Amino acid sequence: MQIFTIFFYALAAECPVERFSEIYYNDRRKGMRLMTKDIKMLAIDLDGTLLHDDMSISPFTADILKKAWTKGIRIVFATGRMFCSARVKLLPLQLGDIPVVCYTGAWTARLESQQVISQDGISPELAGEILAFVRDREWKVQTFINDYAYMAQPDPLEQEYSQYRIRKTIYTGEDFYHPAETVTRMIIVEKNLQKRDNIRKFLEDRFQDRISIVYPERIFIDIHKAGVSKANAIGVLAARWRIRSEQIAAFGNTENDISMLRYAGHSFAVANAEPVAKEAADKTIGSNNEDGVAHAIATILKL
């Protein structure tokens, strides 16, 4: 009890009461009501969260983000997209050379300069094993290396990912199955959700703790190096800025957002989010088409 009391008063001395936010909400993870400190960092997913269904960002959302950035709030967009694809959507916001977490945490780079901050991909050896396993079962797979997409040969299923890509896929034939470089990510597309779940189980049973798998969208199976997640990538940036998890607000809508929703001290799922994301979040806000993220930020930061 004495140790806890000392810690509490030390924290209070560092962060006076008047600096605490007036926002209250029910934290399901702790089963208690919390008073939240001023938010210093926003971690925001793109597709289905910030972006409208037509892939646009509303003027209202752009204005709120600009106000938050001007106020000194650190803004990090965390997406499953390729960096080049995310960059096209985010440059018009004019938020400076901010970090963008891409490939669900496997690649972080600066928005304007394109400087790569970190990469955490699948080794060529492991990638070769996975591709051989996938090939034997005739599953359709795409790899991403140095922000370019690769396939063995053209396939109609490739079009399912085309809306998230601005660079043409590179077809390499037999060489595709023998990568010479680190693979940032692999994607398998499967429209049949039962088959999708079976594929995931086969992969997890075969490769176990050597890979990490998430569903960024209903028909996509993302394969990453074990340990890759949005939370880990965001945590690295937060540590550099000396920002604690309780000072972060995160916004998401799908399974690949769960890690950061659980990591952030304050987490929000949009109304259109999948049930697993809503369960992981502290609160549900307006949908992506209703600018739910922007309205929540405006309330939290009193913009």
Where are the predicted features?
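Active-site phosphate-binding/coordination module
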Residues: 59-158
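Short, Lys/Arg-enriched N-terminal segments with co-localized hydrophobic residues
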Residues: 6-10, 14-34
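Conserved acidic, metal-coordinating active-site core of Asp-based
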Residues: 129, 133, 137-251, 255, ...
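Hydrophobic packing residues within well-ordered alpha-helices of enzyme cores
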Residues: 61, 86-90, 199, 203, ...
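Asp-based phosphoryl-transfer active-site loop
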Residues: 38-53
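Short, acidic loop-to-helix structural element flanking the phosphoryl-transfer center
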Residues: 55-73, 119-126, 169, 227-239, ...
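Mg2+-dependent phosphoryl-transfer enzymes with acidic/Ser/Thr/Gly-rich catalytic loops
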Residues: 36-41, 58, 222-303
